[in-house]
Amino acid sequence: MKFSAIYYGLFILQGVLSSLYAQDSLSTVKLQSVSTAIDYALKNNPDLNIYLLQQDKANSEFKTSKNYMLPEVSASASRQININLPTTILPGEIFGQPGETVAAQFGQKYTFNAGVTATKSILDWQAKTQKKIAEVNKELATLQTGAFEQKLKEQVALYYYTAIITKKALNINKSDLHVADSILLLTSQKFEKGLVDQFAVNQAEINANNIEQNINANKILLAQSVNQLQIIMGLKSAEQLVFEEEVETKLKDWKYQSELGYDKNLSVYEYQFKSSELNLKLQKTAKLPKFNTTFYWGQQQFRDDFALEFDSGSWTDYSYLFLSINVPVFTGFRNKNKIKTAQIESEIARTNLLNEQIKTEAKDELLLNEYRFSVDNMQAVYENFMLTSQNKDLSFEQYEQGIISLDQYFKTFEDYLKAESAYLNALSNTYSYYATLLSRN
């Protein structure tokens, strides 16, 4: 009995600890406002981390491109075995044989070389242009990161506002369902008393079912919005989001906006065009000469055996300075075709930039107009929503008192649902425009 009690106690303790561990393992992220959600996403979005790594890569490539201005220095050592010494034809007078030629061999079988070689590019137009391209690509990577951050802010704001508006819609739906259930109960009671027919009961039940369908649809929309937020905020599915901000049912003081901040996507197109122009210049520099210089300083040792001595008297100095110029004469039609391709790419980049500037200007103007219209529209539909809500409550009281029929009440309730839908849609549209404005300011 004593052993059983101890075992039972340990079992209970294990269950309590497991429960506590499960609670701790569920992480909760509280969102006080849309700014909180945006800041969290900017710190934890996995795709943004890739853009930052691309920035580091471009910066590293730019540093590498500047190395052409520095000399390349290398040390070398070699051992040469002359299996057959070279033969030189000399006049016989040297050997006391006038009028004849003598084949003579000079040198020793083993030669040892050790020295340092320094090579420096004096003038290389291709390397200079590649450095400029790397510099532009570094700036381009930074601008691409900024453009992605702008899009990320817009997505976070859009899903955030969709979530809190849908939560508000669910609260309204639940209130509507409560009223619909009350109508169904009241109609069923009247049916039992013979005051209404089965058709009225069916109408009341259909009305309640329709509202339940709206609730389920909004639950799906809320789950989708939360799921998208979790993804772009870098959260796991087990980590919960808590929205501490709610959409106010009363009208907010919305302000018109006359201008938008600069679209960072345009900067990306501008630098893509710059990069294409530099690439065209790079292809043209392939025709230009290259000037290089090489300096070698070393020592040699000649021997008839394989041994090697390290005293200073055993070595002789050997140094040289080498200047070279490399001029492309004929490379087939490769360079010509590369230049033509680069010209086409540059024209494409220029056209894309011009088109994007025109489209952005038009879209920005349309966005500001739509935002202004949506604010005006939201004010009107909110007033209609509040008025039809009052009419719905009055009609319910009149139906309870038998002053109006169920059909008359349903007509009022239908007007209320239409006004509710219009208000929620207007709220959603206004916040969707505001999400874009927020990302640009």
Regions found by a protein language model. Name each.
Residues D24, Q32, T36, S60, ...:
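Periplasmic alpha-helical coiled-coil/stalk elements that build and connect Gram-negative outer-membrane
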Residues A22-S74, S78, N84, K236-S237, ...:
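Bacterial Sec-pathway N-terminal export signals of envelope proteins
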Residues N210-L235, M386-N441:
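Short segments within alpha-helical structural elements
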Residues N49-L53, K66-N67, I122-E149, F199, ...:
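Sec/SRP-type N-terminal targeting helices
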Residues M1-V34, L424, T430-Y431, A435-N441:
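Bacterial Sec-dependent N-terminal signal peptides
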Residues D24-V29, S76-V116, K120, F295-V327:
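Small/polar, glycine/serine/threonine/aspartate-rich low-complexity segments that form flexible
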Residues A37, N44, Y51, K120, ...:
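Amphipathic alpha-helical coiled-coil segments and their boundaries
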Residues Y51, V73-A77, V116, Y269, ...:
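Membrane-embedded beta-strand positions of outer-membrane beta-barrel proteins
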